[in-house]
From Swiss-Prot:
Residues that bind GTP: 17-24, 81-85, 135-138
tr-type G domain ranges (all copies): 8-282
Name of the gene: fusA
Keyword Nucleotide-binding appears in the UniProt entry: yes
Official protein name in the record: Elongation factor G
Length: 692
């Protein structure tokens, strides 16, 4: 089958936002206008096309980024709907990794919210060009220019409107197109009666002012346009569009548009903007990878002629076809039934069938081309972040980094029958989601599950019940504390045992010192003159790594320290790898008294939105939870409190906020960094862990 859409006419985009900004509704409308859906599903009725997992329909939030393909004006638009809730940032990371562009949806009343900041940061990390869609212009308190201001203030982004709204709230009935210098008026809320008209007289002055600002902003990034602009020459619509496209695809400029997806206003213009300004796979830099074994860096260009290379970005278990592996093709062509190499794992895989997904229905296709997003059935060993490539031309594309879980709970099956099913369920769920971990605690024998937040784990337990029919009891949440050293010291570890026959002997001197935050554990060998033979040095490193898993103060993993092996001694007969491993762990224990060990706790960036009258109560509550208030501002008729609060103090906060504000307050929390716990809290943690 020949390629249906050229690479120039392909767009791979994500739709990203804060929870409740109306992202799923926007995606729905896109699918409706591109002819993929015949009846629109409203999120608040629980019938949205993209939100196809049962929990999503109940909670009205998007959890799994469903990948959908749609067509608009001769272009193929592959859309990945990403979740807006902070506990699912890994889903966002995964989808951003394989996109060429994104639409950031904002709520016109709130502007940029905390989760928008998180997702925006992730998109910047991956260099993803973005358009901003200010949605919910029909909502009470909607303010387009305020929202644009928040993009500058909170994201420090070079964003400029390419449209202006006509009216707001229930008066929102049209959109001014600053590029084409025209207006679109809406005769109803169904999106069926749209008229292109001249800009109404009363809006001309504002439109001229903002068109001038737009041209100036684009000209600053384009020398040729700057020359024309300075010489007072007319800049044509085509030149302006080309300038915006160039600046947007190079991630130097972010066009801002407006609308109300719910009221069917502005969605078609949003689709036009996606095609006009977001990049095709040809506009983004070629993906880099390394050749296994040689570590030589290579590029794979977006072309059907290049060898096949793709990245698996999501695994899902489908009730009908089993395991689905979603992948993005960067180069080459893949036919169903063929063999590929999973170069990350070094395994050969057979691609059984290839499916093009539409929310939760699917269409079987025989071939995928460079730039496509599809799902494969039949891959056995492939997990998220793995590279699939041509067996004759191996490459490993850069993988994705996933954050460590910050919260864990003990979980136990309710019956013997549940026990057997629980193992299967947990292994399938952790295969799908790299930030979800399950393990058995060696000491207590309990099964522990860990994730990115309370909601994340709630949904995992919920899915176990629905999809795998496992009933389980869940314990109280536990925080993932860490330990580290604050001082440097040189310590000795000596293991000598003589008990008939061959003895055991290992002796090391290790210099420990604090490392930069986030750098993890670094081991260096500084031995000179062979006082510790080369073959035992890896054992010293391995011994330290093992010992670091259970810290010296309260048994939590030790992070961000450097260790240098500087001296030691050995015995010709009695020394062994095991003896040096033990000596290294003894050195770590000896470091306790000298290296000033401390406990670190995860800190959450919290934003609470409340009516003015509850301000005092909420500030007091944040302080009582050891929180630091970092800023306050008015947003419409509500107050926003931004604070940094320890995760351990956030359990049950939703209930407390509800009762403190009669259900009128909302909050969101996202993991930010680790911080040293105060001495009194540290003593409590140590006591508790020693069972005192």
């Amino acid at each position: 089958m020949a390629r249906e859409f050229s690479l120039e006419n392909t767009r791979n985009i994500g739709i990203m936002a804060h929870i409740d900004a109306g992202k799923t509704t926007a995606t729905e409308r896109i699918l409706y206008y591109t002819g993929r859906i015949h009846k629109i599903g409203e999120t608040h009725e629980g019938a949205s096309q993209m939100d196809w997992m049962e929990q999503e329909q109940e909670r009205g939030i998007t959890i799994t980024s469903a990948a959908t393909t749609a067509q608009w004006k001769g272009h193929r638009v592959n859309i990945i709907d990403t979740p807006g809730h902070v506990d699912f940032t890994v889903e966002v990371e995964r989808s951003l990794r394989v996109l060429d562009g994104a639409v950031a949806v904002l709520d016109a009343q709130s502007g940029v919210e905390p989760q928008t900041e998180t997702v925006w940061r992730q998109a910047t990390t991956y260099g993803v060009p973005r358009i901003v869609f200010v949605n919910k212009m029909d909502k009470i308190g909607a303010d387009f220019l305020y929202s644009v201001g928040t993009i500058h203030d909170r994201l420090q982004a070079n964003a400029h409107p390419i449209q202006l709204p006509i009216g707001a709230e229930d008066e929102f009935n049209g959109i001014i197109d600053l590029v084409e210098e025209c207006a679109y008026m809406y005769g109803n809320d169904l999106g069926t009666d749209i008229q292109r008209v001249e800009i109404p007289e009363e809006h001309k002055e504002l439109a001229e002012e903002y068109r001038g600002k737009l041209i100036e902003a684009v000209a600053e990034l384009d020398e040729e346009m700057m020359m024309k602009y300075l010489e007072g020459e007319e800049i044509t619509v085509e030149e302006l569009k080309a300038g915006i496209r160039k600046a947007t695809t190079s991630v130097e400029f972010f066009p801002v548009i407006c609308g109300s997806a719910f009221k069917n206003k502005g969605v078609q213009i949003l689709l036009d903007a996606v095609i006009d300004y977001l990049p095709s796979p040809l506009d983004v830099p070629a993906i880099k990878g390394i050749v296994p074994d040689t570590d030589e860096e290579v590029e794979r260009k977006s072309s059907d002629e290049e060898p096949f290379a793709a990245l698996a970005f999501k695994i899902m278990t489908d009730p009908y076809v089993g395991k689905l592996t979603f992948f993005r093709v960067y180069s080459g062509v893949l036919n169903s039934g063929s063999y590929v190499k999973n170069s990350t794992k070094g395994k050969r895989e057979r691609v059984g069938r290839i499916l093009q997904m539409h929310a939760n229905s699917r269409e079987e296709i025989s071939t995928v081309y460079a730039g496509d997003i599809a799902a494969a059935v039949g891959l056995k060993d492939t997990t998220t972040g793995d590279t699939l490539c041509d067996e004759k031309s191996l490459v490993i594309l850069e993988s994705m980094e996933f954050p460590e879980p910050v919260i864990s709970v003990a979980i136990e099956p309710k019956s013997k029958a549940d026990q057997d099913k629980m193992g299967t369920a947990l292994s399938k769920l952790s295969e799908e989601d790299p930030t979800f971990r399950a393990h058995t605690d060696q000491e207590t024998g309990q099964t522990i599950i860990a994730g990115m937040g309370e909601l994340h784990l709630d949904i995992i337990v919920d899915r176990m019940r629905r999809e795998f029919k496992v009933e389980a009891n869940v314990g109280a949440p536990q925080v993932a504390y860490r330990e580290t050293f604050r001082a440097a010291a040189k310590v000795e570890g000596k293991f000598a045992r003589q008990s008939g026959g061959r003895g055991q002997f290992g002796h090391v001197w290790i210099e420990f010192e604090p490392n930069e935050e986030g750098k993890g554990f670094e081991f260096e060998n500084k031995i000179v003159g062979g006082v510790v033979p080369r073959e035992y040095i890896p054992a010293v490193g391995a011994g330290l790594e093992d010992a670091l898993k259970n810290g010296v103060l309260a048994g939590y993993p030790v992070v961000d320290i450097k260790a240098a092996l500087v001296d030691g001694s050995y015995h010709d007969v009695d020394s062994s790898e095991m003896a040096f491993k033990i000596a290294a762990s003894m050195a770590l224990k000896a470091a306790v008294s000298k290296c000033n060990p401390v406990i670190l706790e995860p800190m959450m960036k919290v934003e609470v939105v409340i009516p003015e009258e509850y301000m005092g109560d909420i500030m007091g509550d944040v302080t009582s939870r050891r929180g630091r208030v970092e800023g306050m501002e008015a947003r419409g008729n509500a107050q926003v409190v931004r604070a940094m609060v320890p995760l351990s103090e956030m359990f049950g906060y939703a209930t407390s906020l509800r009762s403190n504000t009669q259900g009128r307050g909302t909050f969101s929390x996202v993991f930010d960094h680790y911080e040293e716990v105060p001495k009194s809290v540290s003593e409590e943690i140590i006591k508790k862990n020693k069972g005192e």
